[in-house]
Structure formats: structure tokens, C-alpha cells
Amino acid sequence: MILGICDGHNASSSLIKRDEILFAMSEERFTRKKNQRGFPEKSVDYILNKVKPDEINYVSVGGVFRRGERIKKLKEFQNRINKKFLYFYHHISHSYLFKLSDFKEALVISIDGGGDGLSFLASIANKNNLEIIAQSDLIDSVGDFYASITELLGFKPMEDEGKVMSLSSYEGEDDINLTTIDYIKELKSFKNYLGVIGYEATKALKKLIVSDKSQLSFEDKVRISKFAQRTLENIVLKAIDDLSNEYNIDNIVFVGGVAQNVKLNSKIAEKYNLFVPPFMGDEGLCLGASLADKRIDRININNTYFGYEIENERAEKILEELKNKLNDYKIEFVEERDIPEVIGNLILDNKVVCLSRGKMEFGPRALGNRSVIALPTKENKEKINKKLKRSWFMPFAPTILYDFIDDYLINPRYSPFMTQIFKVKENKIKEIEGVIHVDKTTRPQTLKKDSNKTFYGIIRYIYDSIGIPVVLNTSFNLHGEPIVCNEKDAINSFLKADFDALLLGNYLISKVK
């Protein structure tokens, strides 16, 4: 077995046994601090409580360069566990996630803000190996360009880039003609013409594209977001086109934080066979470093349920501890076979239901085990936005039963991890308007039964009742907090958000009418 560790931005840990992922989880879920940095102590302890240290062969670490407290913490853990440690470069760790794809050969593109001195790495994946063919230094970072735009707009860089992407879809001017970063074919590298990154880049961009007003209007933000998104799509596709043509490879594995941009992903998927791992950001480094092991060929995944597991026995104890907070709620145990009907009827009654059961998802998306679900109506979109204190301009995503994607989406593809967007058919827009963005696109989880039988059953029950195989599915967390992890997190977040019902394991907590 290989224990994987990422101790940087969005720290995480994982455990792989031969060709199976046993555990993978982000430290932020345990500490309740978003994008938690540093040694992933709590998630590692969770794993070590499930296996004996003697069963672990070695520890793989994503990322090479570190100093100070990070080195100290890793050394302390190495002394404690007494195992060999292997360190892998940041973008190499990202890139080895190609082993989760079913491509025999692929062009692997890793792009993010930066790690171990690089911000871009292109490789050819063949069998178990990576051959590096192109790279960019930190100063020429595409991810940093987009993060600087995020900061310029008043959002949090390296966290709120999704807001920029969402704003870029709104109606508005798209008239900023400026080349601050580009892909240079002759160099096989991106080139940042600003010559600075971080806050200095934010200041430089502000001087170039913002007038002297103290505050940006919504129209200003849309205009700037369109510039950022257009630039991102153009230069990344330019790089992929160049490398794909040169090496005659049409299979693309896209990793790194920039691969969270689903608009960009869909542009790539229009031209190439695309695989984006569900944990494409730095949280995936722990797994990628472990997958660098030459003895591991491919690992097939059809879900991301690798984290903390909700257990009924523990849920019962927590409910007893918190019973004074639950006087206005009814608590009942629901047999597994009855969950689709019980939860389905609540949804049909236009209730908003929180699901917190089984193993926690790994990666940024909630896919049925730490989700808030409801009918995909505009009314529910507004209701949930208000309760979760989300930005009003951010769209919600749906879960759609895979069997019905052709009825709802234009040119759909299997997308089990919400990594792409698709246009919605005109005759279905009114039916599911709560999960459609202003540009008539949606970012679905296309769900097959073998990925999550009970979640599938809930949506199937709804379809059998009203003919709609779709639910609104958003992550179960309050604004600014990580997705809920354990039983206590789920109850506390449920009570604060004041939703209608919570399915905690097999315990249904619902408001007394």
C-alpha cells in the first residue's frame, strides 16, 4: 500500500492498494478551513486508524520544494511512521493522474498557478511512463493570470475563479483587445508579457483595463471576465492544438487547477477526446504522486467516494448528544430500500433535502453523498441561494440520469464528475430552469446506477412520478466553508441553513409540520 500526501495548498492524503483507491480526502474537510495548507494531520490520522502502519510500503509526497515548518512536519511524521518517503515534482504528480483514464496513449496537459517553479507541463503518457515535451516557468503562469483577474474583480484569488467564469457567460461588452499572455509555438511555452505575477500582476492588469472609477459595476465585471475567459480558452487551445498536431495525439488528459474551468474543458472536448480527473486541483497531488509507481498500470473509477464515512451508529450517538437542538424536528430510521421513495416524496413535495451518507466525495464536487438536492426549479434556485448565501450570479448544477441525457442536452457525453458543460435543448429549458446558466448551458453529473445506487434510485423515483429525471444538486456547505465531512458538521450546517430535511446515514431528520 502507498500512503500519499500533499502538504501544500489544499492539503490532502490518500491510500492506494495495488489497483484500487482505498482512501482520498482533503484536509480542509476535517479542519473546516477552506484550502487548508500544511501537513494533512487529521486526514492522515483517519487513514491510519483504518489500516496498520506495517501494511504501508512507503509514503509518496506530491511536490518537492518546501522549507521551514513544512519540512519539519514531514520529518516528524517520517520518524513516527518509519517508512521510506518518495518526493515527486508538483506537475509530475498532477500528470500521473492520467492513469485514471482509459487512454493507452495521451497528451497530458497540466496547468495551474504554479508549483515547484513551473506553471505548465506537457507530457506524452504511454503505458506507465511520462515523456516531458514542453513546460513554462512560474513567471509565465496562465493560472496566475486568471487568478489576478479574480483578485482585480474583488474576489478571492485561487478560490473564486469559478465566479469569473460564471460572469463571462452574461450578456455584455467583449471589447478588451489586449495580449498580456500568449502561447508561443516556437518556444513550446506560454509567455507572460506583464513580466510579473501575483498582486503585482493584478495591479498591472488594473492599470491596463480598468478606468479610474473606485468601484466596478456589474457590467464592468462581465466585460473583464469575458476578456479573461476568452484569453484563457484561446491560449490553452493554441497550446493543445500545437502539441496535438506535432505528436499526432487526439487523447487529452487535462489536470491542474485550470482544469476546474468547465467552459474551457468543453471547448477542448469539442475537438479532442478529453479526460479530466475529478480531483484535478492540488488536492489530487497525493494520489498523483502515488500513481507514479511503475507497478501501477491503470485504476478505473466510477465514483469519488473515498473519504470519511458516515456511520449509523455514530450518527445515532451524535443525534442523542444534540437532541436539545432538535426539539422541532422528527427523527426516524429509514431502511435503505425505502430511501428512494421517502426522499423522492419529500423532493416531490418541493422540499430541499440534505444528503450526508456513506463515504465523502474527493474533489471539489458533491456527487450525492454530501449534497443538497431539490426539484430543478427557478424557485428552488432562489431559495437555496438565499439560505447558503451564495453569489446570485452563480449557476447551480444538476444530476441527470445518464439514460436520459440525450433528451435534455445537445451533443452530450458521459460526465460523471461535473467537469464539462453542455447546451440544454430549447424544449427542456423551462422544465429545469433552476439548473441552467444564462447562456443556456448546464454542468451536469450524468449518473449511472452503478455509481451510486441509492442516489440513482431517488432520482428514478422522481422520474417515475413526474417524468423529470433531474434534480438540482449543490454541495452541502455554508458559504465560505468546506463541504461537510462528518455527522456533527452535517447536523450543524443543516440547522444553520434551515433546510427542510437531512438524511444522515439512514436517519431522516425533518421539520415537524
UniProtKB/Swiss-Prot annotation:
Keywords: Transferase. One of its GO terms (molecular function) is transferase activity. One of its GO terms (biological process) is biosynthetic process. The keyword Manganese does not apply. InterPro entries: ATPase_NBD (IPR043129), Carbam_trans_C (IPR031730), Carbam_trans_C_sf (IPR038152), Carbtransf_dom (IPR003696), NodU/CmcH_Carbamoyltrnsfr (IPR051338). Belongs to the NodU/CmcH family. This is Uncharacterized protein MJ1051. It comes from Methanocaldococcus jannaschii (strain ATCC 43067 / DSM 2661 / JAL-1 / JCM 10045 / NBRC 100440).
